[in-house]
Amino acid sequence: ETIYSDIITAELIAVPLAILVLVFVFGTLVAAGLPLMVGALAIVASFFVVWIFSQFTDMSVFSLNLITGLGLGLGIDYSLIVINRWREERANGLSIDEATVKTVETAGRTVFFSGLTVAVTLLSLGFFPQMFLQSFAISGFTVVLMAVLGAIIALPAAMQLLGDRINKGK
């Protein structure tokens, strides 16, 4: 129960700070909300996957902290790359469709290989005999995978739907 209250406390501090920074960086609430969407998707999906794993193997409760921290951090990080590239492509005169495709081809590749590097590194913790580290390997790999998928699938889809409204209020 303490872990859950710690996670909630951390999120109550981290999310408002992240919103302030994202609004400052992106200049609009709409654009600032997209990285939080990616982070939230990564966290929720990872909780579900880890819950499934917990039915078959021991999982450290501390892996939930890893999921929330990495999920929010990577969701924001990867989204910054993708959104900035999409905005650049729109500023260069590409249509919304063209900008989305070009963004996934370029920034999507960067996010994919960055995530692959982090995921493989975290997965290597699974080779240690301690359950604590093995559960971190599963949780870490999962949340990185979900953040990457969110950034290269869900985020471009959201930007495609929003179009130039992403800059509304700028």
Positions of PLM-derived features:
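Membrane-embedded transmembrane helical bundles of large multi-pass transporters/channels
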Residues: E1-K170
